């Protein structure tokens, strides 16, 4: 019998990729919701939804992800990234459902010189990172057997993201300045969706925190250069700049590369190199 999977935030980048990877998979019966169908910041709405649906798995793709705006919208950011996670976890626990939560590399302060492991000390330097870490803690207090994926620099053909922005700017601007002293790894949302499917399809449930991004490491500047190279954009001069030269409201980690060893070992899985996934995504965007 097909297992029912509740996907929240279904209209976002990851939610849309989950639609595609679940399409035609007879082992799962997905329920896709966004704020119109289910307001996850309302405990009553969640409780009513669970009372009316049998749920085996919850995959929470909903979040407040506007990192700079979060500095001025602490309450809303907290409601979506922490309180809502707790409400979903409480409902999942009462109804015997398993839960997958998406978190972020921004739970770290970026002072490491090696890729971050799951047990490294967390120390977020932004409201966004702090609320995502609060969400992790609230989830594990309520549902210790949950799965948490910390990911980074998410992009896809859907919604607003860095890749689509740089494609647009590359075609409309003569020059661009992009930060070169923040290093991390981009994550193609499709790759993360497939990783979540590996969790759901596994013969046994492997709870815990996992780091997931594509393979490799790169700066925002070099990422932009790669986006333009792959898309054949030659009319825009991309210049490197420092974080100090481009101040933002929220502080960001200078180094947030994630160590994916635990995920790869646990699920016997390989992860694509960031440039291969970027090429596929740009292909999808350009051929829509």
Across the structure, where does each feature detected by a protein language model lie?
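N-terminal Rossmann NAD(P)H-binding glycine-rich loop of SDR-like oxidoreductase domains
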Residues: 3-23
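SDR active-site strand-loop-helix element
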Residues: 8, 33, 58-62, 99-104, ...
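Mid/C-terminal beta-alpha module of Rossmann-like enzyme folds, strongest
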Residues: 13, 202-249
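Rossmann-fold cofactor-recognition segment
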Residues: 31-42
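NAD(P)H-binding glycine-rich loop region in Rossmannoid oxidoreductase-like domains
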Residues: 43-80, 91-93
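Catalytic helix-loop patch of NAD(P)-dependent Rossmann-fold dehydrogenases
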Residues: 79, 84-87, 94, 107-149, ...
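NAD(P)-dependent short-chain dehydrogenase/reductase
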Residues: 137-184, 190-191, 197, 227
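Conserved C-terminal active-site "lid" loop/helix of NAD(P)H-dependent oxidoreductases
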Residues: 219-225, 242-281, 285-288
